[in-house]
């Protein structure tokens, strides 16, 4: 796929809260350090486990800022920039870049979707307008669109995508995607 090749274990990070629904920074730091000490190859913040869709913009910023501070360049920081449409995703992507993310992770647009041509255009726009590698997040249970492996392979071969986080549960398509990228 594009530029640097990311391999290995890149787990999603749960974002802990205090009793009053604030970020529990001490627990967050312990969890991050534990995973890095265990040998992970990167960490994914603000995905489904990080409750990105339930987070305000301020909360997203706080999570990314603290994650970048705690990780301190020991492993790549992957940040979910998930939202309903391309312009909002771009805003999240620009902010994550400013805060020090290494890789951006985006689903296709959801809620109002015109089809696969729009999905392809979405990822092309992200690639053109953001300065970090982009991973496509294939999670049809949440966004109601399955990203076709042929489209993902094409965008990867063209350098639009640096990788895929596959949470589709479709192991056959995943195998085809892997074979295409060997």
Task: Show where each model-derived region lies.
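Catalytic alpha/beta core domains of metabolic enzymes, predominantly
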Residues: 128-129, 140-182
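Active-site beta->alpha loop and helix N-cap motifs at the rims of alpha/beta catalytic domains
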Residues: 2-146, 152-154
């Amino acid at each position: 796929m594009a530029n640097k090749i990311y391999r290995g274990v890149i787990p999603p990070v749960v974002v802990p809260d205090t009793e009053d629904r604030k970020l529990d920074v001490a627990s967050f730091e312990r969890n991050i350090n534990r995973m890095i000490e265990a040998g992970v190859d990167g960490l994914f913040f603000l995905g489904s486990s990080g409750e990105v869709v339930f987070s305000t913009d301020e909360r997203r910023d706080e999570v990314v800022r603290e994650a970048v501070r705690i990780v301190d360049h020991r492993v790549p920081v992957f940040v979910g920039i998930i939202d309903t449409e391309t312009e909002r995703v771009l805003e999240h992507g620009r902010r994550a870049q400013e805060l020090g993310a290494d890789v951006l992770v985006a689903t296709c647009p959801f809620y109002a979707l015109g089809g696969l041509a729009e999905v392809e255009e979405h990822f092309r726009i992200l690639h053109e307008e953001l300065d970090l590698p982009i991973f496509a997040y294939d999670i049809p249970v949440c966004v109601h669109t399955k990203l076709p492996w042929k489209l993902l392979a094409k965008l990867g071969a063209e350098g639009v995508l640096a990788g895929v986080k596959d949470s589709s549960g479709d192991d056959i398509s995943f195998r085809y995607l892997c074979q295409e990228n060997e």
